[in-house]
Amino acid sequence: MVDDIQVEKREKLIETKDKLLEEKLSALDPHEANVLRSQLETKRVATSFFRLFRFCTPLDVFLEILALFFAAVHGAALPMFTLVVGAIFNTFRDFTSYDLKGNEFQHKVNHLSLYFVYIGIGMLGSAFLESFLLVDRGEVLAGRYRKHYLSAVIRQNIAFYDKLGGGEVSTRIINDTNSIQEAISDKLGNVVQGIASFIAATVISFASQWKLACILLSAVGFMVITMGTGATFMAKYQLRSDAIYSQSGATVAEEALSAVRTTVAFGAQPHLAVKYEKVLDRVVKESKRSSYSLGVMLACIWASTFWVYALALWQGSREIVSGSADVGKIIVVITAMLLGSFQLGNIAPNVRFLVKGLTAASILNEAIDRVPVIDGQSIDKGIVPQTKAVGRIELKNVKFRYPSRPDVLVLSDFSLEVPAGSTVALVGASGSGKSTIVGILERFYLPLEGSVTLDGQEISDLNTRWLRQQIGYVQQEPVLFSESIYENISYGLIGTDIEFADEHVKEAKIIQACKDANAWDFIQTLSEGIQTNVGDRGFLLSGGQKQRIAIARAIVSDPKILLLDEATSALDTKSEGIVQDALDKAAEGRTTIVVAHRLSTIKDANKIVVMSKGNVIEQGTHNELIQREGPYKALVDAQRVTKAKSTNVEVLDIEALDISPLDSLNEKFNPKDVSTLSVHSAGTQTTQPPEYQENDIPGVRNPPHSTLMTNTKLVWGLNRKEWGYILIGSLASIILGYCYPAMAIITGQTTGSMVLPPSEYGKMRHVVNIMGWWYFFVGCISFMTAFITIAALSLASDKLVKNIRLALFRQLMRMDIAFFDHKNNTPGALTSILAKEAKMIEGLSGATLGQIQQSLVTLIGGIVTGIPFNWRIGLVATSVVPVMLVCGFVRVWVLTQLSDRAREVYERSGSMASEYTSAVRTVQSLTRELDVVVKYTKTVDSQIFSSRIAIARSALYYALSEGMTPWVVALVFWWGSTVMRRGEASVAGYMTVFMAIITGSQAAGQIFSYAPNMNSAKDAARNIYRILTATPSIDVWSEEGYVAPEESVRGDIEFRHVNFRYPTRPQVPVLQDLNLTVKKGQYIALVGASGCGKSTTIGLVERFYDPLAGQVLFDGKDLREYNLNALRSHIALVQQEPMLYSGTLRENILMGWSGPESEVTQEMIEDAARKANIHEFIMSLPDGYETLSGSRGSLLSGGQKQRIAIARALIRNPKVLLLDEATSALDSESEKVVQAALDAAAKGRTTIAVAHRLSTIQKADVIYVFSGGRIVEQGDHQSLLELNGWYAELVNLQGLGEI
């Protein structure tokens, strides 16, 4: 368990990093500080309400105004019929005073009731148009926000991303745009309705009796002040809450999910869960403050409504006595203002959504309005030469610091000249500034001083888009997009004449690039050839195949400049040799700058530049530098491999060695070949698994579908600790809900007394005075219950969202690796579920739950109250309620269909945004910014187009439910007059029923207005239920299994007849009858082509997967017999691509510790760092071990990240050390030191090393050569050389020339 003090320390460090950064900037020269600030600064944007509509076209403005007009008509219609009510009450007065006969009374009431029917028709039409136009435009405008935000973010300079959390962009583009969509859709309509209703009520009241209207209006000022103050505080705390989650919580989740293999290998789930929970606690703290603000605001509005009406009725009775008003006018004023204030009060919950929308828009607008200091998307900024670049590059006296690390000088007075058409190699230690040179040439960053020119022209004066289109750029870690191979390579043609050429011409160019990059042969073996989809981040291809596709993409445009940042580092030896030949050929006539650790790849460079700490310490050709016997000679000696005595070996076909998950797709799949091992201590019995289905989730026993009951159990189960808050809040909401029916009784008695003849005015005044005190009492009750309802239920809701997010996070950390291989479970999609869908559960809890309970009580209470006062009128009025409910239910069903389609599209668009922004360097180097936005736009627009019919259906059923209210009123008055004519009802009883039914009908409408929230919550609950109830096949939570005593663990490993296929690709054999033995303390190496099964072997030892047949044994026991956590505690893994987490360097190293953190001393941490050759570097940093690593270690170089990862493995003191290309990212000097440390650390431990650099495994006890999932050779280095076979050829291909 992680110590809370350390977690709090980390949180404090992250919170103050901006302040610390500013302090470091202030210590620099003002000019340098300004250059660095310009790359980082984002100005705070104050977003007004009207800026929510900043992306409206003239048509959008017209439709929005039209929609708001219909919303206003809809809102004003309800108070309008109070004029009819007043006329009817005067008719009642005349009837009770015998001025009207029965038939005449009936005829007059029937005539007046028809006006309610007309008003209902008007409300139905206006409600339909309002709902359809607002929801449709809301979806359109939110889509535009999504597109503009992605467009703005993807064009920002790279320093902007150095401060950005890994999951922040995807969270913003899903969560925040969804908040904007809610704010400008039906919630805005509800606000306009409320305002229009109140204004109409006020106008009618003043026109009827201005003195009484003035008294009622006195509450408006108080309400406005209350709402304004409440909204201000809500916005403040909501902004804090959203910012905390997006910047910290989403980043923790995204990093954990993206690096899930590292996370589970080191058992880091508890640490990350604590880290995540701390962020969620801070989110709850700010959300609670926002909820309290809402509670106070609503309580004041409720109470003021009752108190003002007590005064109004008292004053109204006085006006009647004085003869300045009749009962009809008094009823008009009271009823109009009652309905108007009711609508005004209902604005408050909707204001919360407006505040959230404004808060979200202000955050998005910061990025949208930010003008990047380096803009690669602009086509008109800077000089655009009319011809291609020649390729002469020169850097003079360049000084450089990274904006996020201003206290570290990276380049100091650096100068380099690269003649056109020449090849220059940059070598040196990690962190010496090699990759920085590439970043400056690509204009990812700005130099502080000095000159950088291309063909004599300052690159800062050139158009950045044009500049990048002159460069072919291949990074150390190949980045492919989840599209076809053809599309991935075609992105290299952006900006060329061929980009929009005939497809045949374009395809020929792409195919030639594939051939030049040695990729065409393996592409032809794929089932769909060049149209094969490479999968998320290219996971369906091996590392070498991905790199060759990336190289083809870089050279397809025939650029004049090639920047190769470790371009062949991911290739196996055989592939590297052939691809290097292709690159050497491609470099002819081009300016090529190569950053290299493998010195065998740059022997033929025209100039080799040796760098150290940002300076050139040596330069010359390979032979010249060898003869000087300086730093370069030492690097060469460190990489030299003992060569085979004879090179007379048959040349092997590279494709025979290079196997990827897709290479065997043409092979017919026989389900009988796939079997699952029954868990026995010995033997290899197999059982037949069910046939693989596309929708199944690999590695997971899929749960049953969720139902209303399961959703309820889910919510209650995760919220049961807050049952006290829920109980108190529910009781308060029930009491609050009955306040309106109680007011119907009070109003009925009051208005009944007001139709009394003048001779009984004394009785009227007495009744009014008593009822006034009841109003005051009910107002006090509503104040307390409204605050308690919002405060208690919102707190429970905030805790529920926290619990769901934490439970989801822990469950995701529990899932086995096969789960994450599934196409639907990308890091972007899962981060979206954590951010958005967990939040949507509020639709079944919190303020929404309180409003629903309150509305139900008001509806039922209105019926229960009305019927006893006059069952004849009450039953008829109540009979219409089921019709309204049916309309509401149908609307919910339509919304369900709409939400299902929208969720699928927005999850996909969220994953797309996450993919593009996480590969921003690749996107910008390819000048894909506009192309990315176009593709994203198509995805978003497809949802908007497909959802319009569903939106129209939803609007129709909503309109029907709204139009029913005046029709119910017409029915009540028609039937009521009939009953009164018969002498079976009094005015007081009739008015009580009327008021109870009116408020009840409105309550039913309120229930339906929450249908979108309830529907979204239901969909979210279904997805959450799917994950939370899934049980992984390899369960890290299981406490079952053998736990070996520490002293008895040896570290023997054995593979017996192991067959394996990945669950998501069961037709592709990966390991076939693999037999391999590793004894305690042995150092064995696995070599071979990319995709031949080496890393899969590592994964099976870690038990990321189980074999389909055969056994993997640890100390003689099948891995499946062990307790999983206990097993992994004896194993440490260092992967090819180092994955670090946001936090300090100390925390990242401590991730490897498997025991209590309290047992770890600083000396132990430093010792692990020294062994990994990283301690001195850490101590050179101003903050030492407390230095923040940045998102995914973005503030460190590749070699530095890898050494932190090695230190993380060594502090674990494992019995088994798994090294999957552990030194591939290190320079030769560091590699030699680290390899010596690893060799020392391997003593007494079982070590399995996957290696392409054969120099690192010469001393291995046994070397296994893999091909096609089988072992084709085994032995030590010397014996394999003597065989003069597969291994000998790999050695000869990798050796450097003789000195």
UniProtKB/Swiss-Prot annotation:
In the record, what terms sit under GO molecular function? Answer: ABC-type oligopeptide transporter activity; ATP binding; ATP hydrolysis activity
* Compartments it resides in: Cell membrane
Coiled coil regions, renumbered to chain: none
Membrane topology (UniProt): Multi-pass membrane protein
Q: What induces it?
A: Induced in early stationary phase (at protein level).
Question: Which Pfam families does the record match to this protein?
Answer: ABC_membrane (PF00664), ABC_tran (PF00005)
Q: Which residues lie on this side of the membrane: Cytoplasmic?
A: 1-64, 136-187, 236-293, 348-725, 791-848, 896-954, 1009-1299
Keywords attached to this entry: ATP-binding, Cell membrane, Membrane, Nucleotide-binding, Repeat, Translocase, Transmembrane, Transmembrane helix, Transport
Q: What GO CC terms are in its UniProt record?
A: mitochondrial inner membrane; plasma membrane
Q: What is the protein's known function?
A: Transports acidic acylated and non-acylated sophorolipids (SLs) into the extracellular space, where they can be lactonized by lactone esterase.
**The protein, known as:** Sophorolipid transporter
Q: Which organism is it from?
A: Starmerella bombicola
Taxonomic classification? Eukaryota, Fungi, Dikarya, Ascomycota, Saccharomycotina
